[in-house]
Amino acid sequence: MNILGGEEVKGVILAAGYGSRMGEKPKGLLKIAGREILYRTIKNLEKNGIKEFIIVTNERYLQKFEEFVKENNLQNVKLAVNRFPEKGNGYSLYVAKDFVKGKFVLVMSDHIYEEKFYELALRGEGLIVDRNPKFVDIDEATKVKIENDRVVDIGKEIPSWDGVDTGFFILDDSIFSVIEDILKEKEVVELKDVVKRARLKVSYVDGLYWMDVDTPGDLKKARKLIVYSSVKGVGDGFISRYINRKISTRISALLVDHITPNKLTIVTFLFGIFSGLMNLISVPLAAILYQISSIFDGVDGEIARARMQTSKFGGFFDSILDRYVDFTYLLTLAYVTIREPIWWVIAGIAIFSSAMVSYSTERFRGAYCADAYKVVPALRKIPGKRDERIFVTMIFALLGLIKPLFALLAAWSTLRVIITIYLVWRDVNG
């Protein structure tokens, strides 16, 4: 069952335009952050219950779309050909007439939307309008004049307007009768003509990330926005939110088209091990490199989410390698700075309990098949996450306060594990 009232709703994607400003490649097949725009659209609609898709293209681009469907094993996608694309995008919609019955979703092939947009838009009806567009060029946007929640005028140059057309529609097959009426009057049918003639109902999704990709500049902008919206959020500590992510997202935007998440995880791991071994040469330099490795540690996850390549193995792999990095860094730090047996005991407790902080949340995932930070929100407010511990470690190491650092880590990490156990007992099993 999907959120459109339990109906089996299909998705229609218009991709029959030539998009001359972007060269010979169809705009929907342009890759942004490692994935085609169309792939993003299809997969996000699938997440929200849309199971079958019709892509309307033209004869020139048909082979390219056939290759796209085959390469991505999209068995739920059918291709329809508009042999007269010069008749307008309204006519392209009409080409889909024989493929849909009842309610269906209509989107443009060159539009991208954040995940939350899909969730809200699919609860609406008619044309989805944004009254607070933050990411589109208003001069180029199609504006909409609305009265009583229905479209009364639409176009780029209308004198007054209430919102912007997002290129996302929830329609039913009665729209084809409207197109047929217009075809009796003229040969070229634009979608705006259909919307205005039908006086489509309007639903609102305001202020969320969406945009259409018309120029190379739009591609660059879209890549950055996709990466910035791919930050994990839940489970991030204070340092990640206010320092690390501001740097890591910029790195991710540069790398997202060029490297896979798992390869980057390995590179980050090797850099982290290197930071630990640098303690044998320079403790201050090693501390700085350790903090840099913490920043890099967020990049693989951001790229995985931006490229739509998240996997259980990726998270599992990254978590294990993080433990090796932390163990190597703290062990080598202790090796070059500590001589007294009692402080080796304290350092051992610090190393073990630091690993247990991460293990406690990962073990929760294994036991309850859920994210501890989502099920027990109070955990988000407790300091001591990996990013916070690494940042504090850097500060103490730069100040030469190694023994106080190990004492702090031993007490801090142990206390956080105890609090985690208590909160899980209280909120989950209490």
UniProtKB/Swiss-Prot annotation:
GO terms for molecular function: metal ion binding; nucleotidyltransferase activity; phosphotransferase activity, for other substituted phosphate groups. It comes from the Archaea. Residues 231-428 are annotated as: CDP-alcohol phosphatidyltransferases. The keyword Ribosomal protein does not apply. Mg(2+) binds at residue 119. It catalyses: 1D-myo-inositol 3-phosphate + CTP + H(+) = CDP-1L-myo-inositol + diphosphate; CDP-1L-myo-inositol + 1D-myo-inositol 3-phosphate = bis(1L-myo-inositol) 3,1'-phosphate 1-phosphate + CMP + H(+). The chain crosses the membrane at residues 269-289, 341-361, 390-410. It is found in: Membrane. Its cofactor is Mg(2+). GO terms for biological process: phospholipid biosynthetic process. Keywords: Magnesium, Membrane, Metal-binding, Multifunctional enzyme, Transferase, Transmembrane, Transmembrane helix. Gene3D superfamilies: 1.20.120.1760, Spore Coat Polysaccharide Biosynthesis Protein SpsA, Chain A. The keyword DNA-binding does not apply. Its EC number is 2.7.7.74, 2.7.8.34. One of its GO terms (cellular component) is membrane. It is a multi-pass membrane protein. InterPro entries: CDP-OH_P_trans, CDP-OH_PTrfase_TM_dom, CDP_ALCOHOL_P_TRANSF_CS, IPC_transferase/DIPP_synth, MobA-like_NTP_Trfase, Nucleotide-diphossugar_trans. CTP binds at residues 14-16, 27, 119. Residues 8-230 are annotated as: MobA-like NTP transferase. In the N-terminal section; belongs to the MobA family. In the C-terminal section; belongs to the CDP-alcohol phosphatidyltransferase class-I family. PANTHER family: BIFUNCTIONAL IPC TRANSFERASE AND DIPP SYNTHASE, MOLYBDENUM COFACTOR GUANYLYLTRANSFERASE. Involved in biosynthesis of di-myo-inositol phosphate (DIP), a widespread organic solute in microorganisms adapted to hot environments. Catalyzes the condensation of CTP and L-myo-inositol-1-phosphate into CDP-L-myo-inositol, as well as the biosynthesis of di-myo-inositol-1,3'-phosphate-1'-phosphate (DIPP) from CDP-L-myo-inositol and L-myo-inositol-1-phosphate. This is Bifunctional IPC transferase and DIPP synthase. It comes from Pyrococcus furiosus (strain ATCC 43587 / DSM 3638 / JCM 8422 / Vc1). The lineage of its organism: Archaea, Methanobacteriati, Methanobacteriota, Thermococci, Thermococcales.
